[in-house]
Amino acid sequence: MNVHEFQAKSLFAQFGVPVPRGKEITSPEAATAWANELDTPVFVVKAQIHAGGRGKAGGVKITKDKAACAGLAKELIGKTLVTHQTGPKGRKVHRLLVEEGANIAKELYLSILVDRDTGWPTFIASTEGGMEIEEVADKTPEKIIKEAIDPAVGFQGHNGRNVAFALGLQQIEPAVINPFVQMLGNLYRLFMEKNAALVEINPLIITKEKTLVALDGKVSFDDNGLFKHEDVQKMRDLNEEEPLEIEATANNLNYVKLDGNIGCMVNGAGLAMATMDVIKLAGSEPANFLDVGGGATKETVAAGFRILLKDPNVKGIFINIFGGIVRCERIAHGVIEAAKEVKITVPLVVRLQGTNAPEGRKLLADSGLKLEVADDLWEAAQKIVKLTGKAA
């Protein structure tokens, strides 16, 4: 789960990480009132959407005139921002962050996440703050600093000093070394206590006053840990999430909307990804990732059908199920009952493999439903691509 920048900064402040004074704003009138209260030489008005690249898309405005904040708020609220992370449809702006500006002397990059190679929380740092870290890693990997933290021991002062000296803070500004080490400890606490998946500050600035400030922030949470954090759950902004993904979550389905025209319903994440790959190889594009889990019961399949059919781009549905512990004839019964209940209006191809697959395929073939049955993955992909009007 992602949160907005203003929410991330609120968490930073709770854990002792310095941030600019700022406030969430949802109207021009509120912008005026807050600007008068803030009374700073420079005001920064930032669109709040769950995507990066806001500055390049015109979503970040800077002014020295507090009277201009209302006009900037009016300009941004309701605007659709298109960035490299939103896709062509963009994201509509519903709220802003209005905060004080800062005197920037140096920009750094800092984040903490779980390193997939080690399984340990790991700090990522760079002197190339304010840039896309993926671009830095690609073009100048030598500028990426990593410091892994043994979770059995926790963060230690030497971990912070390792990062500080690797960044060259002793040359850049020695006065911030101790506050920097303390900040890393606070970020580690935030990461661990809140079950975060990513905590990122980009840029972390050293000001001309020789202080550290988190100028921009991002926090993502592990969905599996949300049940432990009611305060984090309250930060969820459903306006920023795909409605079909929200519905899928409510039905305990793993769904990600894509831009293709073939709806996929699969049991197991690995098989789901393989299914999307083979659809592309057959000459079409998947409309989604949908993992119905191990059961593939009538209820889960029916919920999956409803979600897929609500996507106007879906011109056909490909069900690809492997029967392991759950036998294929039981899965077939679930598919048949769900299809009758939902009333499928697009071509449907079902591929069954695994325990009692022949029996399951026979049930489907004898069901009287308008569907195609296959036992081979490539054959099934070619069938659904052909039925949706695209040549393989």
Model segments located where?
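ATP-dependent carboxylate/acyl-activation modules
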Residues: 1-201, 205-319, 329-331, 340, ...
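Short amphipathic alpha-helix used as the core "switch/output" element in two-component signaling
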Residues: 336-337
